[in-house]
Amino acid sequence: MEAIRKELSRSYQELNDETDPIARDPEGAQEEEQEEAASAVVPDRDSDRSNTRVHFSRTCLKNVFSVLLIFVYLLLMGVAVFLVYQTITDFRDKLKHPVMSVSYKEVNVYDAPGIALYPGKARLLSCKHHLYDHIPPLIDPGQPGENTCITQNISYTDPYTNSTVKHALIVQGPRDVRRRELVFLQFHLNETKQDFSAIDYLLFSSYDAFLKSTNRVRFMQDCESSFSSWKFSGGFRTWVKMSLVKTKEEDGSQSVEFRQETSVVNFIDRRENPDKGDQLFFVVFEWKDPYIQEIQDIITANPWSMIALLCSVFLVLFKAADFAKLSVKWMIKVRRRHLKKRTRELNHIS
């Protein structure tokens, strides 16, 4: 019995030793509990602060991005306005300054041109058509020869002076350009009081039009007013190579112009004792090439392309404006949401 009592008293003493520190220092235990609670609360507050900072940085980035989008819209609007102005300016310039278009039409046979010669006191000795650029040697220069050309004589009043009567010899020109047809004419002038001797001539587009004209005098006056005249001198053989140029005017009418290249070679006179004032004239008319040059003014400004470009520019402007409007609304919405969340956090803290 005595041994059992000693064992019970020892166990009781050990139990008292374990509970005495808590009983002796109740404030320390309370501080330990507060520290544990604080340690449990502090991580939650730190996580909230980090989340708030991340959300704030995202919001700032979104706002900056939206502002940049607005600036991009303004830049696009400026570029679009400049494009509209430049397009309208270019369209007006193209209307005022059309572009010249040159094309070439190939033909095998030309309409026979008319050759109007003004020999004055000179006399036609011969006129023949030859092919393939071949002119036979002169048999008896200065004497009348073979005349196989179709000719017409006409007299009319000079359209510039209205007082001088002009006498013209109209000759049908070459037609077959593929076989290089040419017309060779020889004139003789026995005496002259002038220091220089030459024969005038002009070219017009159609000999048939002259024949079919009801008023040939008026026709020749119009030709002299419209076409330039040239000369060929005595003592030489003048080779005239013609080319035809057709120009389409703005009113739709068509004008015809002859361009020519001439080459002159000296005539070696082998006649015995020719008269001092005796002059021989030789002239050749031939087509240069089988191409008719056609010229017309083309307005490159296309109103439909300008309208399409303007519509595209305005469509881009409207799309950009709509995008900018949505961006502003989104910025306002994000700002309001941020303010509401901040107010809620402040209320929670308070």
From Swiss-Prot:
Q: What is its main location?
A: membrane
Swiss-Prot/TrEMBL catalytic activity = chloride(in) = chloride(out)
Give me the Extracellular side stretches, as residue ranges: 85-297
UniProt GO cellular component terms: cell surface; chloride channel complex; plasma membrane
The record's similarity note reads: Belongs to the proton-activated chloride channel family.
Which parts of the sequence are annotated with region: Disordered?
1-51
Q: What does this protein do?
A: Chloride channel gated by pH that facilitates the entry of chloride ions into cells upon exposure to extracellular acidic pH.
Query: Does Transmembrane helix show up as a keyword for this record?
Result: yes
Tell me, what is an example of a GO biological process annotation in this record? Answer: chloride transport
User: A Gene Ontology MF term for this entry?
Assistant: pH-gated chloride channel activity
Membrane topology listed for this record: Multi-pass membrane protein
Entry's transmembrane regions? 64-84, 298-318
Keywords of this protein's UniProt record, alphabetized? Answer: Cell membrane, Chloride, Chloride channel, Ion channel, Ion transport, Membrane, Transmembrane, Transmembrane helix, Transport
The record's subcellular locations are: Cell membrane
Question: In its UniProt entry, what is this protein called?
Answer: Proton-activated chloride channel
Q: Which domain of life is it from?
A: Eukaryota
UniProt xrefs under PANTHER family: PROTON-ACTIVATED CHLORIDE CHANNEL, TRANSMEMBRANE PROTEIN 206
Designated gene of the protein: pacc1
Check the record and name the Pfam families matching this protein: TMEM206
The signal peptide annotation in the UniProt record is: none
> What InterPro entries is this protein classified in?
TMEM206 (IPR029366)
Enumerate the Cytoplasmic topological stretches. Answer: 1-63, 319-350
